[in-house]
From Swiss-Prot:
Residues bearing the modification N6-succinyllysine: 42, 55
GO biological process: estrogen biosynthetic process; fatty acid biosynthetic process; protein heterotetramerization
Protein name: Estradiol 17-beta-dehydrogenase 8
Keywords associated with the record: Fatty acid biosynthesis, Fatty acid metabolism, Lipid biosynthesis, Lipid metabolism, Mitochondrion, NAD, Oxidoreductase, Steroid biosynthesis
Parts of the chain that traverse the membrane: none
Gene that encodes the chain: HSD17B8
Reaction(s) the record says it catalyses: 17beta-estradiol + NAD(+) = estrone + NADH + H(+); 17beta-estradiol + NADP(+) = estrone + NADPH + H(+); testosterone + NAD(+) = androst-4-ene-3,17-dione + NADH + H(+)
Active site: 51 (proton acceptor)
Similarity remark: Belongs to the short-chain dehydrogenases/reductases (SDR) family.
Compartmental location: Mitochondrion matrix
Keyword Oxidoreductase recorded: yes
Source organism per UniProt: Callithrix jacchus (White-tufted-ear marmoset)
Subunit structure: Heterotetramer with CBR4; contains two molecules of HSD17B8 and CBR4.
Length: 134
């Protein structure tokens, strides 16, 4: 359902980004806002128009927030995972998974820990000059 996907993926991300940004600005603290998008938001995917549009919106939202909040020392980045081994991907038929993994340069799905490591890096001071990245 178009409206539900947009409400959860895009509006939900907007509301959390807005609240975090306002809280950080009003406290005078610097910080890092990290939004989760998807590679589908960048390259699209058959049968996922609503999902692709919502995740592309997250990318644009994050890049704009980075520009607006940077002067306050607040970094905003988005992570665009590809196909990750989750309960959702376990439901995909094996024939389809074979086709998907054949298109992945590494030849296999990523693990949730792969995404978590990127998020942890972006949240740390080690990424202190990275903002607006996807």
């Amino acid at each position: 359902d178009w409206d539900k996907v947009i409400a959860v993926n895009l509006k939900g991300t907007f509301l959390v980004t807005q609240a975090a940004g306002q809280a950080l600005v009003s406290s005078g603290c610097s910080g890092s806002i990290i939004n989760i998008s998807s590679i589908v938001g960048k390259v699209g995917n058959m049968g996922q128009t609503n999902y692709a549009a919502s995740k592309a919106g997250v990318i644009g939202l994050t890049q704009t927030a980075a520009r607006e909040l940077g002067r306050h020392g607040i970094r905003c980045n988005s992570v665009l995972p590809g196909f990750i081994a989750t309960p959702m991907t376990q439901k995909v038929p094996q024939k389809v998974m074979n086709k998907i993994t054949g298109m992945i340069p590494m030849g296999h799905l990523g693990d949730p820990e792969d995404v978590a490591d990127v998020v942890a890096f972006l949240a740390s001071e080690d990424s202190g000059y990275i903002t607006g990245a996807s």
